[in-house]
Curated annotation (Swiss-Prot):
Belongs to the GreA/GreB family. Keywords: Coiled coil, DNA-binding, Transcription, Transcription regulation. It holds the Pfam family GreA_GreB_N. This is Transcription elongation factor GreA. It comes from the Bacteria. The gene is greA. Residues 47-74 form a coiled coil. InterPro entries: GreA/GreB_C_sf, TF_GreA/GreB_CS, Tscrpt_elong_fac_GreA, Tscrpt_elong_fac_GreA/B, Tscrpt_elong_fac_GreA/B_C, Tscrpt_elong_fac_GreA/B_fam, Tscrpt_elong_fac_GreA/B_N, Tscrpt_elong_fac_GreA/B_N_sf. The keyword Transcription regulation applies. One of its GO terms (molecular function) is DNA binding.
Amino acid sequence: MSEKKHIMTYEGVKKLEDELEYLKTVKRKEITEKIKVALGYGDLSENSEYDEAKNEQAFTEGRIIQLENMLKNAVVVDESEISTDIVTVGSIVKVMDFDFDEEVEYSIVGSAEADPMNFKISNESPVGEGLMGKKVGDVVEIEVPGGTTKFEVLGIRR
């Protein structure tokens, strides 16, 4: 079975590379130091500092593996090839959100770099998937967990 490809922008790849570098160089050293200090407390059977440090180490190593896998399977979107005619990964799309009667601008990104609080939505999310392939002037109704929402595409840019 082949690994899932992660569609990403250059910005998204850079962000993951920076996180990976931080975890490998800074975080690993911090955790190693915490473990050394905790070992100095003696009896490991009731040493919560040691347990906490080992749990943090396991989580960090798991995240390193996850990031390495995502980067290994990244398919980077060439910004120069992003269409301004239709919504694709890498597009910045301005829409009219009829539910809130307001204009909103979303960046369509791969799932690995989605950040909805900053209006970066995954092409695999209900709204992202619903907007993919749409053109300026298209009106689309999208099924979301809270029901159906309606958007009109007002503009598309890189």
